C-alpha cells in the first residue's frame, strides 16, 4: 500500500449504474484500495498551504449518536444520515484563494432499507458490479484490521445500491454554493427533494446519482457548522418537525439542545464494545485511528472527490511522522465491522458480521477527527485521557418517544394546524351533504335543522320497522296454526285408512308357521295388493331369518308365499313368529 509515485485520481459518480464498477478502480490492479486510500513517499505537494483560522468545529463526542437518534427517533423511514462539516479548504492548484469554505465528510450513520423497499427494486446490480463492491469492502476491512483476517467473511453479503451510495459519499466534498449541501449551506436554508422526478431533474449531480441508486427523497438542512443530509428509498413529504429536530440536535454552541431527552436509547456498554460507535475527542488523538483522504474540490462545479493520501496509524500511543508537521489533516476512522480495537480483533463471534448493515444489525460508520497539531499530539492525548477518566457520565433521562398519527392512504399530511382544521371542516361538510341527500324532507337548509330532520326520519323508520316486525310475527303465528290443522287432518285420514286396511288384512291374510328346531316353515296367503311379497322379504330381513327356500304364486287376486328359513341369533316360538309376520306384512304402507 506504499507505491513509489503518488497517484492522484478524481472519482466521479457516473450517470449510469452500469459503470459503477470503475468507481473505485485505477490503472494499477495491484490493489483495489489505491483508488480509495492511496499513499506515497512524497506528500508535500498534496498538502495546501497553511489555512486561515478554522471555522468553529462541531463537538464530535456524540455526533454519530446524534445522527443515529435523528433517524431512529423519526416517524419516517430514513435510510442514512450524513453530516457535512464546514472548513477552510484548498479549492484547487490554480486558485490562489485559500479561504474557500468546503463541506467535507464529518460523520455518517447508515440504517438500511425496509424489506418492502428492497422488493420494489427491479434493477439489481449486475454480478460483476456486485463482486466489485464486495471486493472493495473486503479490501477496506483487511486494511482496517491490519490483515489479521475476517475481510473475506465480512464482504460476502450483497451490497445494496443505497449502501454503495453511502460508502462513496465519504470521498466527496462540496464548495460553498455548489452541490445540494453547498447550496443549502450557502443560503442557510433547507432543500427538500421528494420523488424520482424531483431528484432526476435537480441540477446537483449528487441528487441525480441518488435517484439512480434507488433514493426517492433527499433532504439537506443547513446548520451553523455544516449541513445535515438525509436520504430515504421512500417518498417522504416535507416536515417542519424534522427541521426543528435537526436545529435542536446540531446547535453545538448551545450544547446540542435537549439531545439526551429524546435520543435513541443506546446500550451504555455499546460505545466501548462496538467500534462503529467510537467517537474521537475534538482535540485528542486516539489509538487505532486511520488517516483518510483529504477532501478536494478539484475545480468541479458540483461534486469533488478525494485525492489519494497516505495512511497513518497511531497504535498503542506511538507517534508517526507526518510529511508536513505543521498541519495534521482531517482524519477519518472507517469502521466496516464490529470488533477492531487498537489494531486487534475483539471477539471471534464478531468476525462474521457484514461490513454493510442489514436492518437488524450493524451499520456503516465513518467518523472524522478534528484537525490537530502533530507536535503536541502526545501531550493532548494524555490530557484528553485524564479528562476522560475524571468525567462522570450521566445517563440521559429516558422519555417516551412521541408517535404522531400518520395520515391514511391517499391523504397528504397537513403542514400545520390551520391546514388540519381546514381539512376537518371540508370532511364535515361532505358528510352533511351526504346526509342531506338521504333525508327526504328537509325543513331548512342550516345544519341544525338538517340534523333534526334526520333524527325525525330515523325515528319514523324505526317505528315502521317495528310495525313490520309485529306484522311478520302475526303472519308467522297464523301459518303455524294452519300447518298444525293441516297436519292433524292428514294424520286422521291416514289413521282411518290404516284401520280399514288392517281390518281387511286381518280378514284376508292367513299365516301358517311350523317350527322344527332352528328351522321354520312359513306359508302366507293374502291379497296381492300393496306388494305383500316385498313386505314378506323385508320382514324376514328384520327378524334375521336366513332364507333357504322361497316360492311365490298368484292365483287371480290371491298371492301364496312359502319359505323355509333358519333362525339366526334369536329363537322364535311359533306364536311369536306368526304375530311378527302378521304385523309386518299386514301393516299400512
Curated annotation (Swiss-Prot):
Example of a GO biological process term: extracellular ATP signaling
Biased amino acid composition, Low complexity: 296-308
Compositional bias segments (type: Basic residues): 399-408
Upregulating conditions: By UV treatment. Not induced by jasmonic acid.
Skewed-composition ranges (Basic and acidic residues): 381-398, 409-422
Sequence segments annotated as region (JAZ-interaction domain): 99-150
Effect of loss of the gene: Minor effect on jasmonic acid response and no effect on glucosinolate biosynthesis. Myc2 and myc4 double mutant has an increased insensitivity to jasmonic acid. Myc2, myc3 and myc4 triple mutant has no jasmonate-related defense response, is devoid of glucosinolates and is extremely susceptible to generalist herbivores.
Molecular function GO labels: bHLH transcription factor binding; DNA binding; DNA-binding transcription factor activity; protein dimerization activity
Polar residues compositional bias, start-end: 309-322
Localization terms from the record: Nucleus
One Gene Ontology term, aspect cellular component: nucleus
Tissue expression remark: Expressed constitutively at low levels. Preferentially expressed in vascular tissues.
The entry's keywords: DNA-binding, Nucleus, Transcription, Transcription regulation
Functional description taken from the UniProt entry: Transcription factor involved in jasmonic acid (JA) gene regulation. With MYC2 and MYC3, controls additively subsets of JA-dependent responses. Can form complexes with all known glucosinolate-related MYBs to regulate glucosinolate biosynthesis. Binds to the G-box (5'-CACGTG-3') of promoters. Activates multiple TIFY/JAZ promoters.
Record remark on domains: The JAZ-interaction domain (JID) (99-150) is sufficient for interaction with MYB proteins and most of the TIFY/JAZ proteins.
The name this protein goes by in its record: Transcription factor MYC4
Lineage summary: Eukaryota, Viridiplantae, Streptophyta, Embryophyta, Tracheophyta
Amino acid at each position: 500500500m506504499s507505491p513509489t509515485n503518488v497517484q492522484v485520481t478524481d472519482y466521479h459518480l457516473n450517470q449510469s449504474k452500469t459503470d459503477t464498477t470503475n468507481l473505485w478502480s485505477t490503472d494499477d490492479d495491484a490493489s483495489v484500495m489505491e483508488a480509495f486510500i492511496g499513499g506515497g513517499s512524497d506528500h508535500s505537494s498534496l498538502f495546501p498551504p497553511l489555512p486561515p483560522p478554522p471555522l468553529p468545529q462541531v463537538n464530535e463526542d456524540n455526533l454519530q449518536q446524534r445522527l443515529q437518534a435523528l433517524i431512529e427517533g423519526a416517524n419516517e423511514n430514513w435510510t442514512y444520515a450524513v453530516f457535512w462539516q464546514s472548513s477552510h479548504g484548498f479549492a484547487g492548484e490554480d486558485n490562489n484563494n485559500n479561504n474557500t469554505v468546503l463541506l467535507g465528510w464529518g460523520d455518517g450513520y447508515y440504517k438500511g432499507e425496509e424489506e418492502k423497499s428492497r422488493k420494489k427494486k427491479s434493477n439489481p446490480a449486475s454480478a460483476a458490479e456486485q463482486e466489485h463492491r464486495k471486493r472493495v469492502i473486503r479490501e477496506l476491512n483487511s486494511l482496517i484490521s491490519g490483515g489479521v483476517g475476517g475481510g473475506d467473511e465480512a464482504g460476502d453479503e450483497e451490497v445494496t445500491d443505497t449502501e454503495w451510495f453511502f460508502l462513496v459519499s465519504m470521498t466527496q466534498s462540496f464548495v460553498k454554493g455548489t452541490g445540494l449541501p453547498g447550496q443549502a449551506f450557502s443560503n442557510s436554508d433547507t432543500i427538500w427533494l421528494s420523488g424520482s422526478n424531483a431528484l432526476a431533474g435537480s441540477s446537483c449531480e449528487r441528487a441525480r446519482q441518488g435517484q439512480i441508486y434507488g433514493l426517492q427523497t433527499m433532504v439537506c438542512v443547513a446548520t451553523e457548522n455544516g449541513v445535515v443530509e438525509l436520504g430515504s428509498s421512500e417518498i417522504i413529504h416535507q416536515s417542519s418537525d424534522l427541521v426543528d429536530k435537526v436545529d435542536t440536535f446540531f446547535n453545538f454552541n448551545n450544547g446540542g439542545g435537549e439531545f439526551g431527552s429524546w435520543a435513541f436509547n443506546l446500550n451504555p456498554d455499546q460505545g466501548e464494545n462496538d467500534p462503529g460507535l467510537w467517537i474521537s475527542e475534538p482535540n485528542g488523538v486516539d489509538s487505532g485511528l486511520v488517516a483518510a483522504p483529504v477532501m478536494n474540490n478539484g475545480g468541479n462545479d458540483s461534486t469533488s472527490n478525494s485525492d489519494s493520501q497516505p495512511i497513518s496509524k497511531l497504535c498503542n500511543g506511538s507517534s508517526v511522522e507526518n510529511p508536513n508537521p505543521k498541519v495534521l489533516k482531517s482524519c477519518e476512522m472507517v469502521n466496516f465491522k464490529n470488533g477492531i480495537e487498537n489494531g486487534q480483533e475483539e471477539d471471534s463471534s464478531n468476525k462474521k458480521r457484514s461490513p454493510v448493515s442489514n436492518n437488524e444489525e450493524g451499520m456503516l460508520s465513518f467518523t472524522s477527527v478534528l484537525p490537530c497539531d502533530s507536535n503536541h499530539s502526545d501531550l493532548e492525548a494524555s490530557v484528553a485521557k485524564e479528562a476522560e477518566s475524571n468525567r462522570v457520565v450521566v445517563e440521559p433521562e429516558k422519555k417516551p418517544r412521541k408517535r404522531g398519527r400518520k395520515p391514511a392512504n391517499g391523504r397528504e399530511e397537513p403542514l400545520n394546524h390551520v391546514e388540519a382544521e381546514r381539512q376537518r371542516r371540508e370532511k364535515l361538510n361532505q358528510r352533511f351533504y351526504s346526509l342531506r341527500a338521504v333525508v327526504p324532507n328537509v325543513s331548512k337548509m342550516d345544519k341544525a335543522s338538517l340534523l333534526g330532520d334526520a333524527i325525525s326520519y330515523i325515528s319514523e323508520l324505526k317505528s315502521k320497522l317495528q310495525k313490520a316486525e309485529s306484522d311478520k310475527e302475526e303472519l308467522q303465528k297464523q301459518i303455524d296454526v294452519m300447518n298444525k290443522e293441516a297436519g292433524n287432518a292428514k294424520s286422521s285420514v291416514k289413521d282411518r285408512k290404516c284401520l280399514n286396511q288392517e281390518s281387511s288384512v286381518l280378514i284376508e291374510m292367513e299365516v301358517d308357521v311350523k317350527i322344527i328346531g332352528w328351522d321354520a316353515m312359513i306359508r302366507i296367503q293374502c291379497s296381492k295388493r300393496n306388494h305383500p311379497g316385498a313386505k314378506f322379504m323385508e320382514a324376514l330381513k328384520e327378524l334375521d331369518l336366513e332364507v333357504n327356500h322361497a316360492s311365490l304364486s298368484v292365483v287371480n287376486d290371491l298371492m301364496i308365499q312359502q319359505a323355509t328359513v333358519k333362525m339366526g341369533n334369536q329363537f322364535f316360538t311359533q306364536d311369536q313368529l306368526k304375530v311378527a309376520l302378521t304385523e309386518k306384512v299386514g301393516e299400512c304402507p
